């Protein structure tokens, strides 16, 4: 069944919150869209809404991390990576804070929200920060694994999540090894590399080439 990675993110947070009381979640007035509202309903005392104050949220997340918590800070990718980049670079990454950044509506896939909300630069901005682990899950199942992996990593992590529903590409048995790609299908004529939402498009492209 098709499901968005942002929806899977919210579900994974709520599930992990049951077994790890160190997890806290914060949002910048978009919990209904980022799906952190799922965690909010389950654990209202561990959820913090900062309003439209992304930079403050990131700095607070760093504070939570240095107090022993595992904070997940969420907003749209265009606002998180754009408006709060200095705080991410200095307060989180430079300080090696154990903060998890989960930004949704990433990439050229949110036409419904207008041209100003298309976050294209976020992945390069985050990959350019030393010490930042970047996960771009291709479907809901992989998104849940990415959230679980982020909890286990001691350091900053960026989860790049999408708005649209995506067909399932992986399943519970598909390996999730940070830093290692999965081979979706074998062939010898061409090699197609893809990440995130583009994996399903790459599969369709391969099918067209094969036809």
Give each language-model segment a name:
Residues 1-160, 165, 175:
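Thiamine diphosphate
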Residues 14-15, 181-185:
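Short boundary motifs at domain starts and secondary-structure transition points
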Residues 191-211:
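Glycine-rich phosphate/diphosphate-binding loop of Rossmann-like nucleotide-binding domains
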Residues 46, 170-173, 204-207:
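Surface-exposed flexible segments
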Residues 163-183:
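Aromatic-enriched
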Residues 24-27, 189-194:
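Short hydrophobic beta-strand segments
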Residues 35, 168-169, 201-203:
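Short helix/loop capping segments that flank catalytic or ligand/cofactor-binding pockets
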């Amino acid at each position: 069944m098709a499901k968005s990675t942002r929806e899977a993110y919210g579900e994974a947070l709520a599930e992990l919150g049951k077994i790890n009381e160190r997890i806290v979640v914060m949002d910048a007035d978009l919990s209904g869209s980022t799906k952190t509202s799922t965690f909010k309903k389950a654990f209202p005392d561990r959820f913090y809404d900062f309003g439209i104050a992304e930079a403050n949220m990131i700095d607070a997340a760093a504070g939570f991390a240095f107090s022993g918590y595992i904070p997940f800070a969420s907003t749209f990718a265009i606002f998180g990576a754009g408006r709060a980049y200095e705080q991410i670079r200095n307060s989180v990454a430079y300080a090696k804070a154990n903060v998890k950044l989960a930004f949704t509506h990433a990439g050229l896939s949110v036409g419904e929200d207008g041209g100003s909300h298309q976050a294209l630069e976020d992945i390069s901005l985050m990959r350019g920060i030393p010490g930042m682990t970047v996960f771009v899950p291709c479907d809901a199942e992989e998104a849940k694994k990415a959230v679980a992996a982020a909890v286990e990593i001691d350091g900053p992590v960026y989860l790049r999540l999408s708005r649209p529903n995506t067909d399932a590409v992986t399943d519970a048995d598909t390996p999730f090894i940070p830093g290692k790609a999965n081979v979706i299908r074998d062939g010898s004529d061409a090699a197609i590399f893809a990440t995130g939402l583009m994996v399903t498009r790459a599969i369709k492209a391969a099918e067209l080439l094969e036809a």
